[in-house]
Amino acid sequence: MSSKGSVVLAYSGGLDTSCILVWLKEQGYDVIAYLANIGQKEDFEEARKKALKLGAKKVFIEDVSREFVEEFIWPAIQSSALYEDRYLLGTSLARPCIARKQVEIAQREGAKYVSHGATGKGNDQVRFELSCYSLAPQIKVIAPWRMPEFYNRFKGRNDLMEYAKQHGIPIPVTPKNPWSMDENLMHISYEAGILENPKNQAPPGLYTKTQDPAKAPNTPDILEIEFKKGVPVKVTNVKDGTTHQTSLELFMYLNEVAGKHGVGRIDIVENRFIGMKSRGIYETPAGTILYHAHLDIEAFTMDREVRKIKQGLGLKFAELVYTGFWHSPECEFVRHCIAKSQERVEGKVQVSVLKGQVYILGRESPLSLYNEELVSMNVQGDYEPTDATGFININSLRLKEYHRLQSKVTAK
């Protein structure tokens, strides 16, 4: 069979993408396997050997951890992004980062196709493909789980296992957990399997990034986190003096401390972009600490009205990231506006991390809008109390008129 051309497969080394690799070869493609090191616990060399053994023409293992932190996580921290009030977007942020490198490899290797193992019901198919089409409009995407010839052949995990046996694909000796997991530097997600029943509690042993808060240390870690332009630039453990200043090391250290204290666990039902609700359990240790610390220093340094506008932009940013529009012009515009709002978000925040909680202890900033003398109950400062009378009278006018009308309506 003559080759249909080269395809760059986003490969994880797991059962699904290993079967997809072999299946793509069956279809006549030359497969280039691409593994993104985005902070997950993975034996990358073992995955490389496995991909080559299964017939991959080339294997690229790309460490994108630092750019993931600096170019994707930091903008999310600046924006205080939460999807539907709770989800810190760990998976959503990783996908455009992974896809960007996948497209780079495809262009460098002259591949016309890219492929992924995302299911036809989830958000990731959208995130991967919108990123790929944005960065390389001529690229063609092969999405096996949306192709009838694939999903009619592989109707479940048992079919994949049988295919793996037939084609010499190594199968894990230990039974797979009855749920799916996806990990990166920012978080780990758990879904599907027994978790599809939203009533089922997370089974013991599910969580891997964080300690059970009930079993966490009884003594807190006190951290001082320094921000410049809304980005963390230094973290210091006040108790033992440990300091980290580079982005990746800082983030990894916060993951370690937060994980030890059981910080960052959530169990939610969310609305997928394609229209269905899904249940997800997430651990986002460092991201949770930084969310709270950044929120505090931002409130301390940012003008009230600017912050109201910025909060709206943060909601839009979260929606765009969740739905896969990272590379869209509107998301670029929103990121630029948020970055502008962060120019004076500078200072230090002290936090206590204890038994699943993050407590703000104090903050300081050379650019704070907080005026201790002005707000003091003991010092009048540059404020005339009698001015408040007119302020209250003007603001009460609208309320008086509204209730005057209500009285008339009620009387009738």
From Swiss-Prot:
Instruction: Quote the annotated effect of residue 180 to I.
Output: In CTLN1; increased thermal stability; loss of argininosuccinate synthase activity
| Annotated effect of mutating residue 272 to L | In CTLN1; increased thermal stability; decreased affinity for aspartate; decreased affinity for citrulline; decreased argininosuccinate synthase activity
Q: Detail which positions bind L-aspartate.
A: 119, 123-124
In the record, the effect of residue 359 to D is given as: In CTLN1; mild clinical course
Q: Which residues are listed for L-citrulline binding in this entry?
A: 87, 92, 123, 127, 180, 189, 270, 282
UniProt superkingdom: Eukaryota
* GO biological process entries: acute-phase response; argininosuccinate metabolic process; aspartate metabolic process; cellular response to amine stimulus; cellular response to amino acid stimulus; cellular response to ammonium ion; cellular response to cAMP; cellular response to dexamethasone stimulus
Catalyzed reactions: L-citrulline + L-aspartate + ATP = 2-(N(omega)-L-arginino)succinate + AMP + diphosphate + H(+)
User: Where does this protein hold ATP?
Assistant: 10-18, 36, 115-123
Would I find Lyase among this entry's keywords?
no
Partners and quaternary state? Homotetramer. Interacts with NMRAL1. Interacts with CLOCK; in a circadian manner. Forms tissue-specific complexes with ASL, SLC7A1, HSP90AA1 and nitric oxide synthase NOS1, NOS2 or NOS3; the complex regulates cell-autonomous L-arginine synthesis and citrulline recycling while channeling extracellular L-arginine to nitric oxide synthesis pathway.
Q: Which tissues is this protein detected in according to the database?
A: Expressed in adult liver.
Sites of Phosphoserine modification: 180
Effect ascribed to mutating residue 64 to I? In CTLN1; uncertain significance
Q: Which residues are annotated as modified residue Phosphothreonine in the UniProt record?
A: 219
E.C. numbers:
6.3.4.5
Q: What is the effect of changing residue 284 to I?
A: In CTLN1; mild clinical course
UniProt KW keywords: Acetylation, Amino-acid biosynthesis, Arginine biosynthesis, ATP-binding, Cytoplasm, Disease variant, Ligase, Nucleotide-binding, Phosphoprotein, Urea cycle
Protein name per UniProt? Argininosuccinate synthase
Broad class of the protein's primary localization = cytoplasm
Description of post-translational modifications: Acetylated by CLOCK in a circadian manner which negatively regulates its enzyme activity. Deacetylated by histone deacetylases.
How changing residue 95 to S affects the protein? In CTLN1; increased thermal stability; loss of argininosuccinate synthase activity
- Which family is annotated? Belongs to the argininosuccinate synthase family. Type 1 subfamily.
Places the protein is found: Cytoplasm, Cytosol
Q: Which organism is it from?
A: Homo sapiens
